[in-house]
């Protein structure tokens, strides 16, 4: 069976590493570059949004140190559904294999009084403090003010098109895991 060559010339492709472009799946290189750019943009946005929420709340985070992307992801994961979480559950949800990095983020969040920990037998459960809940609400307000209006142009506001993109990204993640 002969593989049909893509109709887009390689010179027109937007990729991060031309030496990785495959004749069988050149589009995959384009998707990978899109993921790289989107991930970094999303990370920068999360850090800036959290810094804005922290400034509005007038709290000190970890002695003045800004929260990084993993700290913020862990923070929102702990707050999710207002139920205490185990380290393993947070790692699983975020698809992070290096649990020590998540553990470090949780310690940083505890030091900032955004998250608390409580030992139950051999397990440690993490929960959001009242200060943390307030900060999550402030972050949500920043997110609403900055992103929701920009979201509407994707498909007229129904969200179906972006929902399909999210589904495709979850499927793609299975290829890399």
Go through each PLM region and give its residues.
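Terminal interaction helix/tail motif
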Residues: 141-177
């Amino acid at each position: 069976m002969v593989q049909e060559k893509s109709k887009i010339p390689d010179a027109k492709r937007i990729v991060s590493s031309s030496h990785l472009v495959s004749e069988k799946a050149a589009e995959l290189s384009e998707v990978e570059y899109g993921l790289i750019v989107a991930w970094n943009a999303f990370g920068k946005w999360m850090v800036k949004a959290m810094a804005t929420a922290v400034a509005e709340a007038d709290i000190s985070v970890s002695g003045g140190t800004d929260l990084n992307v993993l700290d913020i992801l862990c923070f929102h994961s702990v707050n999710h559904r207002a139920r205490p979480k185990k380290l393993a559950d947070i790692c699983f949800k975020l698809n992070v294999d290096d649990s020590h990095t998540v553990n470090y983020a949780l310690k940083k969040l505890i030091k900032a009084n955004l998250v608390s920990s409580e030992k139950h037998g051999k397990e440690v459960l993490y929960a959001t403090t009242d200060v943390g809940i307030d900060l999550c609400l402030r972050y949500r307000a920043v997110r609403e003010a900055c992103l929701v209006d920009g979201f509407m142009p994707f498909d007229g506001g129904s969200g179906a098109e972006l929902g399909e993109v999210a589904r495709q990204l979850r499927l793609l993640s299975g290829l890399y895991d």
